[in-house]
Regions:
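Active-site neighborhoods and metal-handling regions in enzymes and metal-associated proteins
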Residues: 1-596
Length: 596
């Protein structure tokens, strides 16, 4: 079934169901950014594989909105018959509907794939249209029997040695935030986000590629001072004596996954049901509104997300260890790649093979649990595709005379990593050196910054961009995102003030379509720099040397040169003892950390 046939079938089904238009989100019932293969509806219907897409199909057009990270990629991927729309640069989906569809037109959308917040915004803006819940998802009906199945792998218990907190302690933390000191004796909190559930229960899964989570809903309950979690899940995942005892010890009561709606409907007169608009899907919200007993209370944010974003001391030390492991692995990787491309002058090496080698060197590390996202290894023009994803059938050959960008990460029991380095093994152009240096200066300026408490990531965002602004350039992605603890590599909350204990990335970049791309990414920890003046700053956790071959010395002050030299000395001091039995990697590290 090709793309043209899929669209034809979809439009036929739309006519049968009375839909003038249909909205397709990238997502699932749990508000996941990264989704299981069985939920990749946008990819199935349009061939676009990015993690942010919003589609609209009518009888005349098929449109796909995405953000700046994917502008280059989406042009290459969309099936014929689809048209790209640029988020924040062109009219929004809602504006397109207002400008092109008659009032009263019927629009179908699967309510279970939209959060309360996003569905409400669509319905409010399109209030003169008939918005219908497509309960038998139209894409799934086209997909039919060839749709992939959801995984049923067993769960992993993550011990307190790695989490730093028992489940019972997390129950107390969550209760304190929910009740805000009030004596509320009978409540339940609906938890939909999979990483929230995994964090709360100190459990990990493998239902979604690269994300150690498992499909489930949870009701965190308090009744007369006693806590428990009702977990709605495929029970096969916990069908071991060890897991049954763990659930009993931590007051986890098991239900089948599809029992969440009936259980929600069993409210009590004096019970409060809490939920948050950002993660609860709209169909679930419709169920909550129909409950006649008890009280429904909307939360202003995802409280578990807020708590888990502030890492405890055990988790922080875990991130430090995970990043050292990753730095060791990546020194081995880059030294291998240099030898293959320069010393051996190989011309048969491709991006896909590079990605496989990157995974191989990490697998040598203790407590390695897998990659944290699909490796991005782009050479030359492919480096300009921000979320480029090479594979066995789609890749380019490596070339030592072109820029090579490697954005990769790993899952360790101690923590999650996300690191990007850009290298060049030949003679870079002056433009490449200038733009690399500007990106590096932006990265280091953010890392060295001290700022008042209360500042958000957004409020600091202009600082790493400033060296690009000087020459009229910018990049179309965020500079930072939170990172989960052996959880999702992208973690919220977004827009809240930075707090000591937050782990975030620092990743400015520059991208020139059909030419080259640059990104430099470290993980950093928010720390207190001056307690008396309430000044915060960052502790860098990533120890991979910068690409001296791409640094334009004329653009860097002596102060920055010293800062880079000091950083390179740290790289040598921390990594050289761990590489003493690998002469090739040790020699590479020594050369790359020599004073500028």
């Amino acid at each position: 079934m090709d793309g043209k046939e899929k669209l034809h079938i979809m439009r036929t089904l739309m006519k049968e169901r009375g839909y003038d238009a249909y909205i397709i989100p990238h997502g699932d019932c749990h508000d996941n950014e990264y989704i299981a293969e069985a939920d990749e509806r946008i990819k199935f219907i349009s061939n676009f594989s990015g993690s942010n897409g919003l589609g609209l199909v009518t009888q005349d057009v098929a449109l796909m909105w995405t953000d700046g990270r994917y502008f280059i990629q989406i042009e290459k991927e969309l099936y014929p018959g689809w048209q790209m729309k640029k988020m924040r640069e062109e009219e929004s989906l809602a504006d397109y509907v207002l400008n092109n569809l008659e009032e009263g037109a019927t629009i179908g959308m699967d309510y279970s794939l939209f959060s309360v917040d996003s569905a409400s915004r669509i319905k409010d803006k399109l209030c003169k249209y008939s918005i219908v819940d497509d309960k038998n998802n139209i894409i799934d009906d086209i997909w039919g029997t060839i749709k992939p199945k959801y995984k049923t792998n067993k769960l992993l218990i993550l011990s307190e040695k790695f989490t730093g907190k028992k489940v019972s302690e997390k129950y107390e933390m969550l209760n304190k935030m929910l009740t805000k000191g009030d004596d509320i004796e009978n409540y339940r909190l609906l938890v939909s986000r999979l990483d929230d559930i995994a964090w709360l229960l100190n459990l990990r899964g493998s239902d979604i590629p690269y994300n150690p989570v498992f499909f489930s809903y949870a009701l965190f309950c308090k009744n007369k001072g006693q806590f428990c979690t009702k977990l709605f899940i495929n029970k096969e995942k916990l069908d071991t004596p060890e897991m049954k005892k763990y659930c009993e010890d931590n007051h986890i009561i098991l239900f089948n996954y599809d029992e969440i709606i009936p259980e929600l409907e069993k409210s009590e007169e004096n019970m409060i049901t809490f939920f948050d608009e950002e993660s609860t899907n709209y169909r679930m919200f419709q169920t909550l509104k129909e409950i006649n007993v008890g009280r429904i209370s909307r939360l202003d944010q995802d409280y578990i997300e807020v708590i888990k974003s502030i890492k405890n001391e055990v988790e922080i030390e875990g991130y430090r260890k995970a990043n050292i492991k990753d730095s060791v692995a990546l020194i081995k990787f880059f030294s291998w790649m240099e030898e293959e491309l320069v010393t051996k002058n190989r011309t048969d090496l491709n991006e896909y093979q590079i990605g496989l080698k990157n995974k191989e060197v990490r697998e040598e590390q203790e407590n390695y649990m897998g990659e944290s996202f699909a490796p991005i290894c782009g050479c030359g023009a492919n480096a300009a595709i921000i979320h480029y994803e090479q594979n066995e059938n789609l890749h380019s050959d490596m070339n030592k005379n072109l820029i090579i960008l490697c954005d990769t990460g790993a899952q360790y029991k101690e923590g999650t990593t996300d690191i990007t380095r850009t290298v060049h093994y030949g003679k870079p152009t002056q433009k490449e050196k200038e733009m690399y240096t500007r990106v590096l200066l932006g990265n280091l300026s953010l890392e060295r910054l001290q700022f008042k408490s209360g500042k958000t990531l957004y409020s600091l965002d202009a600082i790493p961009r400033s060296y690009l602004y000087m020459v009229g350039e910018d990049y179309k992605h965020g500079t930072s995102h939170g990172v989960g603890h052996f959880l999702n590599v992208h973690e919220g909350p977004h827009g809240l003030p930075l707090i000591p204990g937050n782990i975030i990335t620092n990743e400015p970049g520059y991208y020139e379509k059909d030419n080259f791309g640059i990104r430099i990414e470290n993980e950093v920890l928010v720390v207190v720099k001056n307690e008396e003046k309430k000044l915060y700053g960052f502790e860098n956790l990533t120890f991979i040397p910068y690409e001296r071959n791409l640094i334009d010395m004329d653009l860097i002050s002596n102060d920055f040169k010293k800062y880079i030299d000091d950083f390179h000395k740290q790289c040598w001091d921390k990594l050289s003892p761990l590489l003493k039995n690998d002469k090739k990697a040790l020699d590479y590290l020594k050369r790359k950390t020599a004073p500028l």
